[in-house]
Regions:
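An alpha-helical support segment within catalytic cores of ATP-dependent transferases
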Residues: 2-12, 136-140, 155-197, 207-214
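Active-site activation/catalytic loop segments of kinase-like enzymes and analogous catalytic loops
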Residues: 230-252
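ATP-binding glycine-rich phosphate-binding loop
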Residues: 15-31
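Active-site acidic catalytic loop and adjacent metal/ATP-binding pocket
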Residues: 26-36, 42, 77, 181-232
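ATP-binding pocket architecture of kinase catalytic cores
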Residues: 36-139
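A cross-family kinase active-site recognition segment
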Residues: 112-168, 190
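Short secondary-structure junctions
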Residues: 10-17, 69-73, 187
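Structured catalytic core of nucleotide-sugar glycosyltransferases
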Residues: 75-79, 84-100, 154-161, 194-197, ...
Length: 254
């Protein structure tokens, strides 16, 4: 990656002089930006075929949450010098890209945090409830797209079940699919709204030193937002929070 090129882009559009390093990203490029005045940001360089509505949905959702002043730890959108929240730009190879910049939140990923406790789980539950309350009034056309990670559409996995070579694992998945089909009609009857849709252990940040009470310092990645039964947001988060716990069901009942 040509960091010098992206440094020039940040200087041109955001007026930020910086040092850059690459962060993790599934489809898009995420660059950690350390400015010369000791501020930290994340430059999000979207995949070449990224739809503008995809970025707009995320930005509008974050702005919506911020406008309600819940004091929840979501990143601030950093506007360009000209007041834009995202820009179209060619990369160093001449490919069209969508770019946007957010303020970096403190903390480390929940999956990497060693001092997990019940207070963190309770705090996360309260935070999800507040987030869901706020997103109940959020609307965007892109929320209604077809999305594999929308739990209402989860039946798509059935046609791929023969890819599972381990017979015992295949039976587990088959049983889950059967149970899913049984509850799907009732799930469709639940209240629908905009949800985050991907509050997993890589999208939750935790901060706090050895002597401090750890706390949820950030929720990231609004890219899997969708219009879905509200309860699905809590179910998704619970599925990840219980990982590596000896008594997972007792944990989500607190």
């Amino acid at each position: 990656m040509n960091f010098v090129f992206w440094q020039s882009i940040l200087e041109k559009y955001w007026g930020i002089s910086s040092k850059l390093s690459l962060l993790d990203g599934e489809f898009d490029l995420n660059i950690l930006v350390r400015s010369t005045d000791d501020e930290q940001y994340v430059l999000k360089i979207m995949r070449e075929d990224c739809l503008q509505d995809f970025v707009d949905m995320q930005i509008q959702a974050i702005n919506h949450l911020k406008s309600i002043e819940l004091k929840l730890p979501f990143p601030n959108i950093i506007q360009t010098i000209s007041g834009k929240e995202f820009i179209h730009c060619k990369d160093e190879f001449g490919n069209n890209r969508l770019l946007w910049l957010i303020k970096k939140l403190p903390g480390q990923k929940y999956v990497e945090f060693k001092r997990k406790n019940l207070n963190l789980v309770k705090e996360l539950g309260r935070m999800i409830a507040k987030c869901d309350d706020a997103l109940e009034s959020f609307e965007h056309d892109f929320l209604n797209r077809s999305l594999k990670w929308n739990l209402i559409e989860a039946y798509w996995v059935e046609k791929h079940i023969d890819l599972i070579e381990d017979p015992s694992r295949k039976v587990i998945v088959q049983n889950i699919i059967k149970e899913y089909k049984n509850i799907l009609p009732k799930l469709r009857e639940q209240p629908f709204q905009a949800i985050h849709g991907d509050i997993n252990d890589h999208n939750i940040l935790v901060a706090g030193g050895l002597k401090d009470q750890p706390y949820i310092s950030g929720i990231l990645d609004f890219g899997d937002m969708c219009h879905c039964p509200r309860v699905c947001n809590l179910a998704i988060a619970a599925a990840y929070v219980v990982l590596d716990h000896d008594q997972p069901l007792s944990l989500i009942h607190i």
